């Protein structure tokens, strides 16, 4: 039987794993599913059609799965899906999707959301990302694996941030951030590649060199985007580390940050 504090309000229709924990004064709604080993602290609200996987930890005053902050939302049965091994610190808010897009807000595995961070409706967050304090992403944003969002940074709706990118503190991201890129400023502009992050994750010197060459083609050689994409795609034939960048640039979005 789940470890539920006597003051917690858990709807009988909620599905809570036998070894999950729900802290004092927390509220768990009828459509919620909580996986094995997940720990929900005191004063947490989990509501809506929300599925939370295994071994997550949710700290006090977080709000997970509530309706989106979107004028178009009309009460549709949209969802929030959270994977395994995530940490949500104090006052984190994660909102459900909308019928106008995916209908689901999705968070992968192994992510760390520090205090006061926000994930809006229909966002897709990958794996092993870090959202520093007060980082916020608007609706329909995609954050790929291993991204680091600096404190007080934000991403405009429909924006994309590619794998291993780093968004600096206070940065306002109005476009798409290519994989491996570091951006900062208001509005955010590119400032090289995330070399230190790549080293920490086991990339070799040769792989990092290929990433830097691709960045140079994209931003430093005065090439059109089409020509830069072609050059990077050609390099990727012998440098598979560039495959995520090739795939990212092939998808039309808000346009890459400049």
Q: Can you annotate each of these PLM segments?
A:
Residues 3-189:
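Structural signal for interior beta-strand "rungs" in well-ordered beta-sheet cores
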Residues 1-7, 12-13, 18-19, 55, ...:
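Terminal amphipathic alpha-helical/low-complexity segments used for targeting or macromolecular assembly
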